């Protein structure tokens, strides 16, 4: 009744995981490396880290029977390119010495991985790196 367009989706879980994949691949890496989003896809090592983190999360989706709308790595890279000059919210949190949402992003991947018996070493490392930064505030 507010006159706003609305879309009802039976695919809420898919939409949440699609969004999570982008955050998994971009946020912690930009915060640790202290770089804008585009840097991640402009340099080989950071691009590989993005891929590894997202592929770990993708394995969890597959194990849970969640069919994503996009190839998550390509989608994440596309978002990084489209927002190349932007600094992620996690980067901004770290820059301002605020507690981040790491536990709800990469930490969620780690927790789901543990429940499902799926190793998530890259995401676990990213969580520990961000927590180490936060502990220094």
What is the predicted role of each segment?
Residues 18, 22-25, 29, 87, ...:
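Alpha-helical structural signal
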Residues 25-36, 80, 102-105:
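Active-site/ligand-binding neighborhood in enzyme catalytic cores
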Residues 1-22, 29-70, 74:
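Internal alpha-helical scaffold of NAD(P)-dependent oxidoreductase catalytic cores
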Residues 51-137:
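NAD(P)-dependent Rossmann-like dehydrogenase/reductase catalytic/cofactor-binding core
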